Structure formats: structure tokens, C-alpha cells
């Protein structure tokens, strides 16, 4: 991947988030979230809007980047997985007829081969009329690559 980029996003396009103190973690839920403790964070600048398909397309055009959803999976990383599960794709939201058991995400998310930021509902769908919609099907690694190209970084917990 080339990191040819337009340079840092100008500060006049960002909003300032003031620093402060917050309570991080929890003592009441999962052990790995504890112990709860106070954390001081410095102020920072943040993009006030979601990244659009248009902006993400500019990044992909400039770098040749392929998202996680566009890359096939390596069978060696998933021994015994059926080959049809190793094709590029992503999970697509499926509207339910009513309330469902939230412990079973397959009731409202469907693995869709070919779904990606370019094809949000899978093959046959496109972003042609959605240039200014928020980009979807972007993994953390994809967001990191976009942020680095834009001269920024992703926010962290603290």
C-alpha cells in the first residue's frame, strides 16, 4: 500500500474536544474491565462528521487499498472451515419481524459473500447514489489505514 496522501486534514475542518477526567473501566461487569479508575486525557481534535463513501473512495483510489471485507481469508488460518466461508464478504443487517433473542446475532446479521464498502448489501448493490453516505463494512484495520493516509489517528479509550 502506498501512503500517498493529501496531507493532514486542515484544523479548520476539525472540532476541538477539551481534555478532562473520566472514570474508565468497571468493577461490576467483566473482570477484564476492572478495576475502575480515574483517567486524565488531554484535549484533541476530531473530525465532526463520519467518513463518507466519497472520502473513502479517494483513499482507495490513491493507495490501491483493499479492505478486510474485500480480501479472501487464508484457509491455514481457519483449519476445517468450509471453503464457502473463506470468500471475501461481510455481515449485512437483516430486519427482523419483531423482537429477537439478542444473544444470537445471526437473527439480525447475515454473512453475505461479496458485501463490502462498494457493495453494502452484497453483489448487485452499489454506492453509486450514496457518495455522501457514511462508509460501511470497514474493519478497524481499514479505519487505521484511512486515518494514517489522512494524516490523523483513531481515538483511543484514554
Which positions does each model-derived feature cover?
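Extended beta-strand/loop cores of jelly-roll/beta-sandwich
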Residues: 1-158
Amino acid at each position: 500500500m502506498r501512503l500517498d496522501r493529501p496531507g493532514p486534514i486542515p484544523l479548520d475542518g476539525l472540532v476541538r474536544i477539551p481534555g478532562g477526567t473520566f472514570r474508565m473501566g468497571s468493577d461490576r461487569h467483566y473482570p477484564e474491565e476492572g478495576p475502575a479508575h480515574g483517567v486524565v486525557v488531554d484535549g484533541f481534535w476530531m473530525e465532526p462528521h463520519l467518513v463518507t463513501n466519497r472520502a473513502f473512495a479517494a483513499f482507495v483510489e490513491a493507495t490501491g487499498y483493499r479492505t478486510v471485507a474485500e480480501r479472501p481469508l487464508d484457509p491455514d488460518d481457519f483449519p476445517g472451515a468450509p471453503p464457502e466461508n473463506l470468500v471475501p464478504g461481510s455481515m449485512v443487517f437483516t430486519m427482523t419481524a419483531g423482537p429477537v433473542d439478542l444473544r444470537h446475532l445471526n437473527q439480525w446479521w447475515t454473512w453475505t459473500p461479496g458485501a463490502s464498502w462498494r457493495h453494502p448489501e452484497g453483489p448487485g448493490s452499489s454506492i453509486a447514489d450514496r457518495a455522501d453516505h457514511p462508509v460501511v463494512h470497514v474493519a478497524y484495520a481499514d479505519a487505521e489505514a484511512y486515518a494514517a493516509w489522512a494524516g490523523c489517528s483513531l481515538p483511543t479509550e484514554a
